[in-house]
């Protein structure tokens, strides 16, 4: 892979992965590659979604899964100079973003949700995982994702207050679903 061509995106938009596939690949090699990529997510939050996605197929990896794992390596080759930079500021600002897809996993129709928290513009905490439930609408998916990120935001606020970094102001969590935002402002019958 040292002589490979770099790519600008981690995964081709609109790609759907499935457990069924044409040809199996060496599971040990696949697990080693995914393990190394998981290690990189500690410092490269941009890898989180795709690495979590391909890690679902470690029991019986197919050729399409390995191709995406190799595409991540090609992406890394083109983004060696990318990093997270932390800058000091008297005014500390904690901001969260959350997003999810709706029933994108074609094997069990569960959704993937994720969040990222920024402290003064630099990512300090992030997650991407498959939801444990099957939801019935995109509003419900986004509401579940936002609730999970809010719970983590409460924990993160407590840690930052204990360290003396953050005052007692509220955290803003950004969500891109207007129905989920309205539901969170008026949680009638929820």
Kindly give the residue locations of the regions a language model identified.
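Divalent metal-binding acidic/histidine catalytic loops
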Residues: 1-190
């Amino acid at each position: 892979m040292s002589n490979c061509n770099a790519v600008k995106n981690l995964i081709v938009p609109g790609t759907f992965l499935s457990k069924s596939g044409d040809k199996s690949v060496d599971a040990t090699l696949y697990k080693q590659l995914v393990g190394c990529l998981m290690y990189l997510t500690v410092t490269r939050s941009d890898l989180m979604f795709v690495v979590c996605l391909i890690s679902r197929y470690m029991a019986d990896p197919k050729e399409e899964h390995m191709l995406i794992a190799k595409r991540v390596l090609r992406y890394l080759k083109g983004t060696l100079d990318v990093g997270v930079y932390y800058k000091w500021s008297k005014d500390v600002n904690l901001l969260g973003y959350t997003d999810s897809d709706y029933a994108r996993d074609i094997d069990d129709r569960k959704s993937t949700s994720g969040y990222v928290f920024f402290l003064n513009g630099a990512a300090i905490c992030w997650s991407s995982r498959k939801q444990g439930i099957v939801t019935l609408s995109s509003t419900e998916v986004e509401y579940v994702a936002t609730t999970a990120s809010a719970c983590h935001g409460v924990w993160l606020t407590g840690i930052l207050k204990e360290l003396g970094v953050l005052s007692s102001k509220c955290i803003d969590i950004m969500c891109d679903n207007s129905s989920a935002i309205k539901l969170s402002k008026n949680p009638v019958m929820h």
